[in-house]
Amino acid sequence: MSYPESKLTGLTGFALAAKVTGGWAGPVVSITNLDQLKANIGTVTPQVLVINSNISASSLTKVNMGANKTLIGSFQNRTLENIHLRATAQSQNIILQNLIFKHSANIKANDDIQVYLNYGSKYWIDHCSFVGHSWSTTDGSEDKLLYIGEKADYATISNCFFGSHKYGLIFGHPADDNNAAFNGYPRLTLCHNRFDNMEVRAPGLMRYGYFHVYNNYINKFHLGFTLAQNANILSESNYFGEGSQNNGMLDDKGSGTFTDTNSVPPITNQKSPKAQWTATSNYAYTLKTAAQAKDFTQKNAGAQAAALVFGS
């Protein structure tokens, strides 16, 4: 059984600021079936859970997570199909790495999301692939690939691939109801990710939280950022490819704050005022140019069959 043993190498962003450790303080456990996954990931004991056989369910199957876990895909087998990971009230300090998330096209309701984090803090999602499926604008689907919101906090999504899906990612309390209880949640970093063939929400629909989004490559899209209720977004050196000719990089509802620097092409249709915070007040990081980010993510984003390469 071979798997990435880089541990906390490449940890960056708000997950770094929160000192995420996952389960690396505990033993390594080989996971080969759904029952083993459920039995181990739901506890709070530190463990490194290595997916050593692809795990598939014929219908949507929710798996509740505990705390202090590293769930990591082996270099040989690393696919979770129709397995939906859900946070619980005890969830915190979790690393998801080198995993392939697949789901059937008929699992498409609004809340059908394979990674759903609405509790806890200290999450690192790294080198994962959310591979989607064929879609059309009229297929009736409402599902998304990933959600981090409500009171979930201090998270980083890095070096991941998101592709072939009508809706992409959604962050923050999922309503435009100006609910002050959710202001500031989540604090989230998105960096060195590749988004391809998605209609909207790549890199995401963002509400309420603080979002640092840098060095991502978004290609074949209709709308990129959707800035909604009370979101505070810092965008740096992101590369928008096919689809940018329609100026859909930013869908700004005018109800948050937004600052972009050095993205390609420049974002010019901002309605909201500029953001009043800086990422460097929370953690240090190194920027690539937008062109360098495009090249890096095409080569290195997503789950891998050999050693992981990190953008930070």
From Swiss-Prot:
What protein name applies here?
Pectin lyase
Q: Which domain of life is it from?
A: Bacteria
| Annotated GO MF terms | pectate lyase activity; pectin lyase activity
Q: Which InterPro entries match?
A: Pec_lyase (IPR002022), Pectin_lyas_fold (IPR012334), Pectin_lyase_fold/virulence (IPR011050), PEL (IPR045032)
Q: What is its EC number?
A: 4.2.2.10
Q: Where are the transmembrane segments?
A: none
Catalytic residue positions: 201
- Description of what induces expression: By DNA-damaging agents such as mitomycin C.
Tell me the segments the record calls region Disordered.
Answer: 254-274
Q: Where is the composition biased (Polar residues)?
A: 256-274
At the top of the EC hierarchy, this enzyme's class is lyase
Keyword set, alphabetical order: Lyase
Catalysis performed (reactions): Eliminative cleavage of (1->4)-alpha-D-galacturonan methyl ester to give oligosaccharides with 4-deoxy-6-O-methyl-alpha-D-galact-4-enuronosyl groups at their non-reducing ends
- Annotated family: Belongs to the polysaccharide lyase 1 family.
One Pfam family per UniProt: Pectate_lyase_4
Coiled coil, from the record: none
> Which Gene3D superfamilies does the entry mention?
Single-stranded right-handed beta-helix, Pectin lyase-like
